[in-house]
Every structure is written in C-alpha cells, then in structure tokens.
A protein has these predicted regions:
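N-terminal leader segment of winged-helix/HTH proteins
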Residues: 1-46, 93
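N-terminal helix-turn-helix DNA-binding core of bacterial DNA-binding proteins
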Residues: 33-80
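Hydrophobic alpha-helical core bundles mediating ligand binding, dimerization, or RNAP-core interactions
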Residues: 21-43, 118-136, 141-155, 159
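Charged, amphipathic alpha-helical coiled-coil/dimerization segments
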Residues: 2-8, 87-149
Length: 163
C-alpha cells in the first residue's frame, strides 16, 4: 500500500491501494495518448503546427492578446511566442496592431481568415466532444462530468503543491 500525504483530508496520510494507483496511472496515460493523437490529427486537418493551433485557440477567450499574455497562457518564453506569432501572421490568421493607450505595446488580434479558421476548429472540437458523449449513456454522463470536475480539481491542487 502507498501512503500519500493529503493536506485536505482529516487524516494526514491516506492509504491508496497499489492496484488503484496503477489503474489511475494507466488510465491517465491512455487519456493523454488519446488526446495527443487527436491533437496530431487536428494539426494535420487544419494545417497548423501544434503551438500555432494552441495559440490561435487562445483568441476564443480574448479579442486582443499581447505576446506577454500569450507566453503566460502557453507557459513558454516570449521568444518562442514571437516565432509562433510570426507563423500565424505569415498565414494571415492574426495581425499586429498598436495599442491605442500605449504605442510601445503591440496587440494581436484575429484576422477575418483567422476568425473563420478558429470557428472551424471550434466546430470540429464540439463535434468530437459530442461524439465522445454519445458513447456514454445519459445516466453515466452526469457521473462522468462530475468525476472529471473532481479529477481536475485534484490535479490542480497537486500542481499548486509542486510550485
């Protein structure tokens, strides 16, 4: 049995049976591989490298972004963002505009072509997620979504402990 410190439980040490730990590791690995394969398919389908595709998707949440903001959201250095942004500009998916409040700052925004591409990507993702949910009975969906929320919260809590 593995003893795992748990700062959220009443008992400071939680017993995690080895079989559960192994099953969890195996499932996480398989989910990660499945997501990686979908990302590769998506990159091929939309003819964008992974980093450019992930960057483009950030514009779904924001009308304007800065290179610094992209670097923070993508967890990469600003010089890497410059290369990604240059690729998206070359493909006419985003454009640079001067910040009206600070001419030293360049804002990045989607072009009409970029907006259309992002809509295609989002429609593709919506369809993929719909197809996944269709594989799960309506009764099980609620439990799956609840458990995914719990998993996400647990993973974020552990991530915070690592920082």
């Amino acid at each position: 049995m593995n003893k795992v410190a748990n700062s959220y439980a009443m008992d400071p040490v939680v017993d995690v049976p080895e079989y559960q730990l192994q099953q969890f590791q195996s499932l996480i690995l398989k989910l990660f591989q499945c997501c990686q394969e979908r990302m590769q398919y998506q990159c091929d389908r939309f003819q964008l490298p992974d980093a450019e595709l992930r960057c483009l998707m950030l514009f779904g949440e924001e009308r304007y972004l800065t290179a610094k903001g992209i670097a923070l959201k993508m967890n990469v250095v600003k010089s890497r963002v410059s290369k990604i942004v240059d690729g998206l500009i070359k493909k006419k998916l985003i454009q640079r505009i001067k910040d009206p409040e600070d001419s030293r700052v360049s804002l990045l925004s989607l072009t009409p072509v970029g907006s259309e591409k992002l809509n295609e990507i989002n429609e593709f993702l919506k369809d993929v997620h719909y197809q996944v949910l269709c594989q799960i009975t309506p009764e099980q969906r609620k439990a799956v979504l609840t458990n995914l929320d719990i998993l996400k919260a647990s993973m974020e809590a552990v991530k915070e402990m690592m920082v």
